[in-house]
């Protein structure tokens, strides 16, 4: 499957303890990157964010996390302009959900996350599904030869 890839959610938006990395200064098309990063990046590349959420073993947190995504989390991100490329269940670590988001560039990513974090529907959803988790996030730009741009 050519278009299958990954992504997941922001650390500052959760009430539970999280570990999230800061995004790079630039992400997306080669023209927006430093020369050392742009060499293999496409001119029409988007910014991709791969996120891994590992839920605690308590209270069935992974099931609550999946329900939160099913119920509204994906829709809230899409409402604010993100493309949710895919969402996966890790088989080697059943308490981890992996997902991938796509944006035009870093500025668009920041705009999407600001809208998401301030969305009243997100506040209600977060309270309904109070999941304790840790977050790993990776930012990528597609290569100039990638099928997914």
Residue ranges and their predicted role:
Residues 7-15:
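Bacterial N-terminal signal peptides
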Residues 19-120, 130-149:
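Short S/T/G/P-rich N-terminal loop/turn motif that feeds into the first structured element of a domain
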Residues 123:
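Short, surface-exposed beta-strand/loop patches at domain edges
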Residues 1-4:
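Positively charged n-region of N-terminal signal peptides that target proteins for export
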């Amino acid at each position: 499957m050519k278009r299958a890839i990954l992504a997941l959610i922001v650390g500052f938006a959760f009430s539970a303890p999280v570990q999230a990395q800061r995004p790079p200064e630039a992400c997306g098309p080669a023209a927006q990157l430093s020369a050392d990063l742009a060499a293999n990046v496409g001119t029409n590349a988007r910014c991709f964010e791969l996120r891994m959420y590992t839920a605690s073993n308590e209270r069935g947190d992974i099931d609550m996390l999946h329900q939160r995504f099913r119920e509204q989390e994906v829709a809230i991100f899409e409402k604010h302009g993100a493309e949710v490329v895919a969402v996966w269940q890790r088989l080697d670590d059943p308490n981890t959900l992996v997902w991938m988001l796509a944006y035009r560039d870093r500025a668009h990513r920041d705009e999407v996350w600001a809208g998401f974090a301030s969305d009243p529907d997100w506040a209600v959803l977060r309270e309904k599904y109070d999941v304790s988790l840790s977050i790993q996030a990776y930012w990528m730009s597609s290569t100039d030869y990638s099928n997914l741009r």
